[in-house]
Amino acid sequence: MLLWVQQALLALLLPTLLAQGEARRSRNTTRPALLRLSDYLLTNYRKGVRPVRDWRKPTTVSIDVIVYAILNVDEKNQVLTTYIWYRQYWTDEFLQWNPEDFDNITKLSIPTDSIWVPDILINEFVDVGKSPNIPYVYIRHQGEVQNYKPLQVVTACSLDIYNFPFDVQNCSLTFTSWLHTIQDINISLWRLPEKVKSDRSVFMNQGEWELLGVLPYFREFSMESSNYYAEMKFYVVIRRRPLFYVVSLLLPSIFLMVMDIVGFYLPPNSGERVSFKITLLLGYSVFLIIVSDTLPATAIGTPLIGVYFVVCMALLVISLAETIFIVRLVHKQDLQQPVPAWLRHLVLERIAWLLCLREQSTSQRPPATSQATKTDDCSAMGNHCSHMGGPQDFEKSPRDRCSPPPPPREASLAVCGLLQELSSIRQFLEKRDEIREVARDWLRVGSVLDKLLFHIYLLAVLAYSITLVMLWSIWQYA
């Protein structure tokens, strides 16, 4: 009896169940497959829970970075601004489906806010960049979630400006989970390291900086003894293009230094050299004021090119001081002091021989022995005016003592006065010749010292310039 009742109830309910199933099937075929799939995936989905069925299994997040542009390098604040293409994917075990049940759909884009997303950040972030908002992610039917987005990254970087403008900077972008340990979230590299390093396919290579490579590096670190975290570093290596700074900074400084060296060929006994070098010094000072805003400045270091400018300024000051010294030396005839013997020997013989100027530095003063011999030969003539009294006691010049015998005693005293005037004129001329000879000696000494200081100055400038050029060449092609 009971069996008969059950069969009767089944016979009555079967048409109703078949009708309901047919109605549900008709409704499912009329709804779009994307809506049905979205409802299937997101219904009862808990985005606050890590998407694994076994909590002991870590979620592996694969990441990739492609540098698109170097926007700004702020040496003063030690900040690097880059524009990158960031890609990451992970497996969400709660977002899987059979494509045959949903019109062979193999991937779907859904809002990022609707699913679980790993908390991977860049440790060096110092400011929020102006990145476009990409609100969707791609999901494949195996549960693979792909998150692609461009990022404007403003990060802290230790910038070394000592080699400016031939500097190479190495800044890191460190991706790590802010909260989860490696037992929960592990990080891996999407592509091979060689491909990441040499990928410049989208880099805008028209700016001041040249991308040398992106070097990935993975490590595990611990902030506490029991908790380890995974991090992926990308070292962005960039090099500055120095052509603009060479043209606007180095070449004007080199031209001014060359003009200072050429200024040594002006005569040392003229005042034009002093005024010329003062003009160069003032011009270089104005040049430094103009380029001061171009040079990078930090609180912890100064670029070598700044030291180069300071040394060039010091060399110009030394050159001006040397010129003033030489001009003062060659105008020393006002003091009426002859060149000391030791200075004559040192400068006109030793230094002149060293500089191959010995023949030009030999004094042309007539020997004093001939004049003394002439005086001795004429001394026997006697002083004929000594018997006439009065002005005859003045000193007689060698020409007077060699003059013919005086006229008779009754000659006029005017003759002796005339001889006395002639003697005074001769003494004046001899004194003037002596002063001129002293001036010529000091001029020879000044010329030799000027040549010596010029060679020393030239060697210092060349040695300093060659050293800097070698250093900058090594840094440029390192």
Curated annotation (Swiss-Prot):
Region annotated Disordered, chain positions: 389-408
Keywords, in A-Z order: Cell membrane, Disulfide bond, Glycoprotein, Ion channel, Ion transport, Ligand-gated ion channel, Membrane, Postsynaptic cell membrane, Receptor, Signal, Synapse, Transmembrane, Transmembrane helix, Transport
Broad class of where this protein is predominantly found: membrane
Compartment(s): Postsynaptic cell membrane; Cell membrane
Membrane topology qualifier: Multi-pass membrane protein
Stretches with biased composition (Basic and acidic residues): 393-402
Superkingdom per UniProt: Eukaryota
InterPro entries on file: 5HT3_rcpt, 5HT3_rcpt_A, LGIC_TM_5-HT3, Neur_chan_lig-bd, Neur_chan_lig-bd_sf, Neur_channel, Neuro-gated_channel_TM_sf, Neuro_actylchol_rec
Gene Ontology CC entries for this record: cleavage furrow; neuron projection; plasma membrane; postsynaptic membrane; serotonin-activated cation-selective channel complex; synapse; transmembrane transporter complex
Transmembrane segments: 242-268, 274-292, 303-321, 456-475
Tissues in which the UniProt entry reports expression: Expressed in cerebral cortex, amygdala, hippocampus, and testis. Detected in monocytes of the spleen and tonsil, in small and large intestine, uterus, prostate, ovary and placenta.
Cleavable signal peptide: 1-23
Similarity comment text for this entry: Belongs to the ligand-gated ion channel (TC 1.A.9) family. 5-hydroxytryptamine receptor (TC 1.A.9.2) subfamily. HTR3A sub-subfamily.
Protein name: 5-hydroxytryptamine receptor 3A
Organismal lineage: Eukaryota, Metazoa, Chordata, Craniata, Vertebrata
